């Protein structure tokens, strides 16, 4: 009985060391590299917050975010898009308050030194801003998309935040 008790005691004594070692390895592996970028971000998902560079407000209704007049997102370039290009889709809503306060609003986008055609909406509603992204604008594994509205509701007039449009998702896919 004595050898069994000694063996159990030894196992219990060294068990925490093994656990700490595995935990330290997983922490350092996570710290070494950023999580993989998504090619489509759903703005109701808090896990994509690191890809929303600027101009996005907090999640609302677990599904969407208001934007400011200018907003920036980084997306993973789909495999092969550097050769054949990609399609951009922004699922958005132009709320009635935006049309009431500002009239028609125009959204434009750019990637590096390239611009994508703007689109204007004069009625409230749900829309999809779709654009082809030429392969020449996809130069690496990630794509920084900069969006700009021609106008936004200034902070303090309706809300404490500058309000542009409501976005539920932004994504790149192969053409």
Short names for language-model regions:
Residues 100-114:
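Short, surface-exposed beta-strand/strand-loop-strand elements in extracellular ectodomains
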Residues 84-92, 109, 127-129, 138-156:
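Short, well-structured beta-strand segments within conserved domains
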Residues 20, 107-111, 126-131, 169:
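Catalytic cores of nucleotide-enabled group-transfer and carboxylate-activating enzymes in metabolic
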